[in-house]
Amino acid sequence: MSFFDSYRKKMQMPSKEEVLPGRVQPIPTAAAHFVSGHPLKGPWPDGMKQVLFGMGCFWGAERLFWQVPGVYVTAVGYAGGITPNPTYEETCTGLTGHAEVVLVVYDPKVVTLNELLALFWEEHDPTQGMRQGNDIGTTYRSVIYTFNAVDRAVAEKSRDAYSQALASRGLGPVTTQIADAPDFYYAEDYHQQYLAKNPDGYCGLRGTDVSCPIPLAH
């Protein structure tokens, strides 16, 4: 396979016939958040809400959100594909269909979904399709997965507002997928809160320098 054929393949979602089979049992992961000590898989306090963000390599994206006041816990994992309970190595092949994502569990009385969305839009480039900077492939696509119809509508409205802001600067279009939350598979222990364990580790987050115009209260 030539370089160009290989590149083109990495930019395409796999077919059902191509995806890896995965496994029935979840892969082992951490029980608690390395920074906060809160349970990674719950139970969480009453009133917490959830959202999944994919914005390239999940190491830097997770650190972005665990630092936000009102975010109770974060975890990295895989979502949006077909392969059940994938490993990191399998996901990197592009043959699971999954994106690297961050689960954000937050208290809406302290931080709003719009505030989290503003961070999402401003801290990566949502116009790059199946890549994020030097990280190339469907694994690194931009996604927002919400857990109810109201939150999905809020996310879509924020996308429309940010699309206009980008267009005014000659940028776009936005390629971010917004959809109902699919199954979320926790990543391996060593990926959880990676940049807290490895402060000098890789972080590929790069924004567009365009501010998000959405109202932060919702």
Curated annotation (Swiss-Prot):
Its EC number is 1.8.4.11. GO terms for molecular function: L-methionine-(S)-S-oxide reductase activity; peptide-methionine (S)-S-oxide reductase activity. The active site is at C57. It comes from the Bacteria. It holds the Pfam family PMSR. It catalyses: L-methionyl-[protein] + [thioredoxin]-disulfide + H2O = L-methionyl-(S)-S-oxide-[protein] + [thioredoxin]-dithiol; [thioredoxin]-disulfide + L-methionine + H2O = L-methionine (S)-S-oxide + [thioredoxin]-dithiol. Signal peptide: none annotated. Keywords: Oxidoreductase. PANTHER family: MITOCHONDRIAL PEPTIDE METHIONINE SULFOXIDE REDUCTASE. Has an important function as a repair enzyme for proteins that have been inactivated by oxidation. Catalyzes the reversible oxidation-reduction of methionine sulfoxide in proteins to methionine. Belongs to the MsrA Met sulfoxide reductase family. This is Peptide methionine sulfoxide reductase MsrA. It comes from Brucella suis biovar 1 (strain 1330). The gene is msrA.
